[in-house]
Amino acid sequence: MAKNYYDITLALAGICQSARLVQQLAHEGQCDNDALNTVLSGLLQTNPPSTLAVYGGNEQSLKMGLETLQSVLNANRQGPAAELTRYTLSLMVLERKLNANKSAMNTLGDRISQLDRQLAHFDLESETMMSSLAAIYTDVISPLGPRIQVIGSPAILQSTLVQAKIRATLLAGIRSAVLWQQVGGSRLQLMFSRNRLFKQAQSILAHI
C-alpha cells in the first residue's frame, strides 16, 4: 500500500513542534503559546476525522513543526538541531514502548478522558491543567523509560511551572508519535525517505 506522505509529514511535524517547544522552554523559560496550544489541544482529539484535525484543521498551526522537521532532516550531529533530533527520536522510542504496553495505553486513555471535567473550569494552558498533564506524563510515560534528558538553563529548569510545561509538551509529543505510527510512519523513512519528507514539508510550508 502506498504511504500517505502528507499525513506522515503532518504527524512528524507535530512531534517536531513538541521537541522545539521543549527546547524553547528549557533554554528561555517560555515558548510560542499558539504552537503550544496546537499540540496540547491535539491530546484531546481522541477520535479525529483526519490527521490535520488533530492540529486544529489548519496547516499554519504546524508551521514551527514543519520548519523544525526540515532542520531535523538536515541536522548535523552537534548544535541545536542535534538536540531537536534527540528529543524527536526519544519521543518515538517512548511511543513504541507505550504501544507495547496495553495497560499503560488504557491508563493513558482513561486519564486523558478525565481532563474534560477540569477543562470545564480551567483553560488548557492554565497552571492547573499543565500540572495535570505533567502528572499523566510522570505517572504513565516516565515509567516506560528511558527518560528524556532535557538540556537547558539550570536556573530555568528549577521552575516547577517550566518543568510541568515541559512534561505536558512531551506528552503532546507522544500523542503525535502515536498518530505518526497510525498513519504509516516508521523510523526507516527517516533514513531512506528523508528527501521525500523534506519536500513534502517544503510543499506544505509553501502554501501556508
From Swiss-Prot:
Alphabetized Pfam families for the sequence: DUF489
Gene3D superfamilies membership: HflD-like (1.10.3890.10)
Domain of life: Bacteria
Keyword Metal-binding on entry: no
Signal peptide location: none
Similarity comment text for this entry: Belongs to the HflD family.
Protein name as annotated: High frequency lysogenization protein HflD homolog
Organism: Yersinia enterocolitica serotype O:8 / biotype 1B (strain NCTC 13174 / 8081)
